[in-house]
Every structure is written in C-alpha cells, then in structure tokens.
Amino acid sequence: MHSLLRPSRFSANQSVLCLLQRHRVFFSSISVKPRKRMVYCVVSYRGTGFAGLQYNANVKTIQDTLFQAFARVGAVVQVNADSPKKIRMCSAARTDKGVHAIVNVLGLKVLDNQPLPHVVNLVNDILPPCIRVWKMARTFNSFSPHTVCDSRVYEYWLPVSSLLTPRPCTLEAYVIAKASEKAFPINETLSHLANLSKQDCVANSLSEPFRLSKPKLDFLKHACTMFRGTHRFHSYTTEKGFSDASSRRFLLDVRVDNLHIDKLNRQWVKLIFHGQSFMKHQIRKMVGILIHLTRTGWNAQVLLNTFNNSYRIRIPRAPAEFLLLNQPIFQAFNKKCSRFDHEPVEWSCAQKGIDQFAHSFLRTPMFDCFISSESFQSFFILQKQFQLFQDLALLTSFDFLEPSSRRDILGEK
C-alpha cells in the first residue's frame, strides 16, 4: 500500500527530463554575462588634430580614438562598442581642442578575459603614435578619476619674445603712452585701427632671439602670485557669471618654473598652474592677461579687480598648442588604496617612456612649429589687445605703476 503511494525515483527523474526537453529552447537562449572589471588607464597624447579629449558624436576626439581601439582588441563587449558611456569611461582632467597631456588617467570597465599588460600592447599597436597607453591596473568598481582626483597640474610654455615691449611708433605703443598720460583718445584710435593690416598688428620680432630681463622676470613672478588662493574666475571663462558659485576656484600654485633655450636660440619661460580644478579656457586666459601686463607694465594689482568686479573682462586666449596637462594628483585616493590593499594610481614603471614621449611628441614639435603655426601672431592682433586694454582701463582708471618702476619693466631709458 505504501509503495503504491510513494512515487518512484525513476518516474521523478523522467518528469524532470521531460520538463527540460520541453523548455530546451528557453535554456539554450540563456548566455553567461561576461565578467567586467573597473580599471584605471594611464595615457599620454598630443592634442593637435583632435577636437579635445571628451567624446563627441561625429567629431574626432582623443577619448573616441581610445574607445575604438579598446573595442577592436576585444576589451569591450560588442553590445557596448557604440558609446564610451556604456563602459563608464571618464578622465581625471579634461583638455580642450589642441591641448596636450603628458599624463592623464582614464577610468573604464573592460572585459576580464585577457591580461591587462597584453591589452596595453594590443591597443598601442592600433593607436596612432601621438597617443600612448602606458599602464592599466585593476581598481575599485566605484572608481571615477574625475571625482577622486585631488588636483591637476598644467604647464604652459611661453615664448619670451611674446613679452617684448611694443615697438615705438606703433599704434599699440601710442595707445599705451596716451593711457599712461590719462588721455585715452578712443575715437581717434578706432579710426586708425580700422585701417590696420594684420602685419601692422603683429609684433614682428616674435621669432628673433630675445632674452627676458630681470625686471620683467620679477614682474611676471609677482603677477603669478596674485592668482594663488580662492578667487572668482568668471572673467577667465565663457560659461560662468560673477554670481555663479562654481566660478570660484582654488589655485594651490601659479609660478614661473624655469627658462629654456631651444635649438634655434629662442628663450621660453615655463609657467606652472596647480589647482583643484580649472574651467574652460581658464588657463589660456590667465596666460593672456599675464602677457598683456608684462608687456605694458600695468600694475599687477589689477588682477584683484578682475576677481572682485562683476564686469566681465574681454581677455584674449593664449594659443592652445603650448598648454600641456602635466599630471593629475591622487594623493587622498592612494591612501585609501593602501588601506584596502589596492594598487595606487601611479605610473613610475612607465616614467622613462613618458619622458621620452613628452620630449619627442610634445615639447620638441611645439618649439619647432612656433613660427609656422602663426598662433601667437593672431593672438597679438591689436583688436583683441585693444578690447582688453579698454576693459582694464574701466576697472582701474589707468592705475599704472610709478613712472620709474614702469621704465624698469619696459626696459625704457
């Protein structure tokens, strides 16, 4: 009696087998989800010919070029190979069109199907020589380089000839002289300005050997210190207003780092900008006003007025091809990595290759193309300089240095 009520083992197995056969189509359609891991990626690149770092549809960018390379080597699953957002690809620092990077750090999710050093080699074989991947390493799944980055360090290589005092008998020298006398003939100047050609507006000695005098160098060093600390940089970007809280930025250091003489006997000054974060065009506009103040001998205290006045100053942007992202800083995040036994974000193992890349693909071409690019020539078109001169005059009521100090800076007798 009990044996009849108890189902046999054979009948139970047979029922399971029938159920599996009935749903064999459903089970065959199930695939194992590929395993992905968050990694950080250390890269260097030359920004010439690219529309910046950030991915932008139908535009050639650094991030898109890297993403396509990762997809081609099989580091990205096929269904995610149409957008970097699907693999959470982001960078520690953003660079604008034409700006280079000695070191930048990206975060992205890649398939855990091959060793990361092997992926680096495969990607570098596909990438153009102006973009290099130096290292990939596993990190936290929540890693976002833009968020955990403490600060960014940029460098700007300024040709010393761009700091040359305007030549006598030029319109620019005439405007400066009249302003120093507190007589500013705007109507007369504008009538002359309309008849100027490009050659008349450009300092013709940009490519000639020129050495920065000690008074000019001291003035430039002092002007750089005015940027340190927390200020409103609304006049140094195109996207923020005076009342916008995000226009307040903290700069840890702005300084003159060193002087360099290239193979054509031209002197360059290296400026360092170290801050928590920077806005669009901020550094290039900071360099632009530093050039103007050093050339004209304007009181460096005027920089404080650009921070504290709601009026937006029309500052011309210095050329982009002389701006380099030196490195992002991850000091706080690396301390966290040591506590949780994760590899810190560092690239000492590739430092030799990075230095060689920076010399061969960034600084040397930058020095060589200085004359042919004509970027500084267009920067010195008097129309742009005249607008800046007007705006500074409105802020300061022509608050120049004392005549004796001004003569020392300008090299006048």
From Swiss-Prot:
It is found in: Cytoplasm; Nucleus. It comes from Schizosaccharomyces pombe (strain 972 / ATCC 24843) (Fission yeast). The keyword Isomerase applies. GO terms for biological process: mRNA pseudouridine synthesis; tRNA pseudouridine synthesis. The active site is at D96. Its EC number is 5.4.99.-. Signal peptide: none annotated. GO terms for cellular component: cytoplasm; nucleus. Keywords: Cytoplasm, Isomerase, Lyase, Nucleus, tRNA processing. SUPFAM superfamilies: Pseudouridine synthase. It is an enzyme of class 5 (isomerase). Its main location: cytoplasm. Disulfide bonds: none annotated. The keyword Lyase applies. It holds the Pfam family PseudoU_synth_1. This is Putative tRNA pseudouridine synthase C16C4.06c.
